[in-house]
Amino acid sequence: MKYRDLRDFISKLEADGELRRVDVEVDPRLEMTEVCDRTLRAEGPAILFQKPKGYRMPVLGNLFGTPRRVALGMGAEDVSALREIGELLAFLRQPEPPKGLRDAWSQLPVFRKVLDMGPKKVRRAACQEVVVEGDDVDLGRLPVQTCWPGDAGPLITWALVVTRGPEKERQNLGIYRNQVIGRNRTIMRWLAHRGGALDFRDWQRERPGEPFPVAIALGADPATILGAVTPVPDSLSEYGFAGLLRGSKTELVKCLGPDLQVPASAEIVLEGHIHPDDTAPEGPFGDHTGYYNEVDHFPVFTVDRITHRRDPIYHSTYTGRPPDEPAILGVALNEVFVPILRKQFPEISDFYLPPEGCSYRMAVVTMKKQYPGHAKRVMLGVWSFLRQFMYTKFVIVTDDDVNARDWKDVIWAMTTRMDPKRDTVMIDNTPIDYLDFASPVSGLGSKIGFDATHKWPGETDREWGRPIVMDDETRARVDALWPKLGLD
């Protein structure tokens, strides 16, 4: 099923029993986090808080709190169907030349579908039904959550940030948290390698001293939100990918101020600018690591205008020790990653990002090993192939007789197939998540790979062990005998 906007998705979830409305007063300060955290850990529904304490605007929480709801948001019925989305993205990243005329004709519908999904510009939009400008702008009217007791203040978490570098036609969409520090000011926390930060850097180089236009969409349709966190190939915009997921073009409307296009169906849009010289200390905030992050300086976003729908809904979340919503998103998007990796490395059988590893800090890869040193090639490939794995600190590679998603299997392989000196690869001075306080330098640290595969001649001089497996005849006899044993 496809969803026109966030409200359409809410209606679908409610009809399926996947969303509950809460009419009891709940405080956006701390209480909503505790309610959502307990609900997520119980694999419970999305929550629409209809009476946030001190506010008239309802708050939507725990929207992507189960892998199935992530799949539904991407237009699929279950998580397994996300492999098809990954296969499409893998094809678009590296389309193979047609093998003949018939093959060329068979590929034509795919390219036509992609070309037809460019965004559609509209003049009027629901997100601009109400306009608030100048001195009337007050972020304090939004029920922004303060998530944890040690947080520096309210934090906008599902901010879909829209930017464009100088002389660029294509806009960048990224989700960057924003700390509210005043009536019309937030701190934009984007890391140096992210698209928004790169656009800002280019702007400063080309137009020094000039304010950088920025817009933030809150409460976009699920396809647009999820398109911003999916590994979309450079040849396809996030808006175009959202159109593919939705099955219809993403409708965009020009901001009333900056020359930027925002999702027409968004609940709320913040329009404004960042001045190159305006920064402020951001944090601390409880993060997906389970710890409070360090305080660091980031640009200040000044909000010049707020536009929104009539009776808008504020979409929010929290981050904390896994499982949290980012971890659940990681579990679902894992299925998108697998076909993309297999396209580049056909020997890969499965790929798994354990949610306990903060969504991306550890990866387990199973493969069909074909030659000595093969596992090391694969682990180096994982680190370098997709931007999403730039911060993956630990990569475990093992044979395809191991279940990558079963820790008992993985630990067995590591403890029986590895020599710590021979089978580890350590790389120093690599990019590391700024939130990773374990690294010796902020943003720079090491990575380690574990080769837990069977060793081939050339990797060892010893006779390799043979796994213990019961023969099929005995298993069949015991299967027939089992009901008579009274052991169930």
Swiss-Prot record:
The species this protein was found in = Alkalilimnicola ehrlichii (strain ATCC BAA-1101 / DSM 17681 / MLHE-1)
Q: Which residues bind prenylated FMN?
A: I175, Y176, R177, R189, W190, L191, R194, G195
> Which of this chain's residues are annotated to bind Mn(2+)?
N172, E238
Which Gene Ontology terms describe the biological processes this protein takes part in? ubiquinone biosynthetic process
Report if keyword Metal-binding is assigned.
yes
Protein name from the UniProt record? 3-octaprenyl-4-hydroxybenzoate carboxy-lyase
Q: Which cofactor does it need?
A: prenylated FMN; Mn(2+)
Membrane topology per record: Peripheral membrane protein
Function, as annotated: Catalyzes the decarboxylation of 3-octaprenyl-4-hydroxy benzoate to 2-octaprenylphenol, an intermediate step in ubiquinone biosynthesis.
Q: Which residues form the active site?
A: D287 (proton donor)
Q: How, per the record, is the cofactor bound?
A: Binds 1 prenylated FMN per subunit.
UniProt keyword Phosphoprotein, yes or no: no
Which cellular component terms (GO) are annotated to the entry?
cytosol; plasma membrane
Q: What is its EC number?
A: 4.1.1.98
At the top level, the lineage of the source is Bacteria
- Give the main EC class: lyase
Q: Which InterPro entries match?
A: UbiD (IPR002830), UbiD-like_C (IPR049381), UbiD-like_N (IPR049383), UbiD_bacteria (IPR023677), UbiD_Rift_dom (IPR048304)
